[in-house]
Amino acid sequence: MSENSIRLTQYSHGAGCGCKISPKVLETILHSEQAKFVDPNLLVGNETRDDAAVYDLGNGTSVISTTDFFMPIVDNPFDFGRIAATNAISDIFAMGGKPIMAIAILGWPINKLSPEIAREVTEGGRYACRQAGIALAGGHSIDAPEPIFGLAVTGIVPTERVKKNSTAQAGCKLFLTKPLGIGVLTTAEKKSLLKPEHQGLATEVMCRMNIAGASFANIEGVKAMTDVTGFGLLGHLSEMCQGAGVQARVDYEAIPKLPGVEEYIKLGAVPGGTERNFASYGHLMGEMPREVRDLLCDPQTSGGLLLAVMPEAENEVKTTAAEFGIELTAIGELVPARGGRAMVEIR
């Protein structure tokens, strides 16, 4: 079987970050008294559901450690590797850091798919690592019933510049660096609904590095940062709000969206992860049409950075973004928490 004839997505029950365990189930898994052990040098653990762990070396520098892997979201092996690696490396950028090394995680059904196809996946991962300026230094592989690929990535960051998802403040404006709709477009493609002019758009967005995060970290007015992945914009924004004790007002029309995404939602191209996200976070939302809900809960794979920015830093953030070819528009704001109001209001 050649790399050109296979459809990797046929060999997995999930796709990309959409195969994440739901937040509700994850809460049960992670609930443990032992998890309360605290190392004073561990600046960021799993208590705020940040993008990565951060360990203070005590010399002004901290180490960032993260891992991310998933099943195929596209059929092309090389692109699958690129997307999975780009998604994993993004966690380092979301913390404001610089990646320095990665190792691969590979699960492969060796009796179903040839090692040559696995090599193409790995080469895609290596290509993404080179784009980030790091080596794919090793890894671990197992014989698995479904193809899985990802990375464990190590990075560094000046301790004073670590960006968490829990340090946002009321008054911050919200910015998103990539358009929403990755889950919708990839689902539309699987259902043979995707128009020719939209072919490859989701892959292009997923392969785009969030390298700007390291530069955003240098801006004092960037108070919080996270990447939007499997829990959708609603999930990751809710976690930012919960961690900081604030609420959000979002302008739906200002949210960047992939072309055709609203049409595909109406045609039923909604991934299964969308409903799981709504089941976990829907109670935090105000009233809104079903189509709006489905986009805000759409699981993103290798999605954009969500930034909480003080108004006085807006111009500097936009200028920095432009240096990376990113055009930013505020999609909302954070406000003081008030009882009786939805955590995330859509206008």
Curated annotation (Swiss-Prot):
One of its GO terms (cellular component) is cytoplasm. ATP binds at K20, T48, R49, D50, D68, D91, G139, H140, S141. InterPro entries: PurM-like_C_dom, PurM-like_C_sf, PurM-like_N, PurM-like_N_sf, SelD_I, SPS/SelD. It catalyses: hydrogenselenide + ATP + H2O = selenophosphate + AMP + phosphate + 2 H(+). Mg(2+) binds at D51, D91, D227. It comes from the Bacteria. Its cofactor is Mg(2+). The active site is at C17. Its EC number is 2.7.9.3. GO terms for molecular function: ATP binding; magnesium ion binding; selenide, water dikinase activity. SUPFAM superfamilies: PurM C-terminal domain-like, PurM N-terminal domain-like. Belongs to the selenophosphate synthase 1 family. Class I subfamily. Homodimer. Synthesizes selenophosphate from selenide and ATP. This is Selenide, water dikinase.
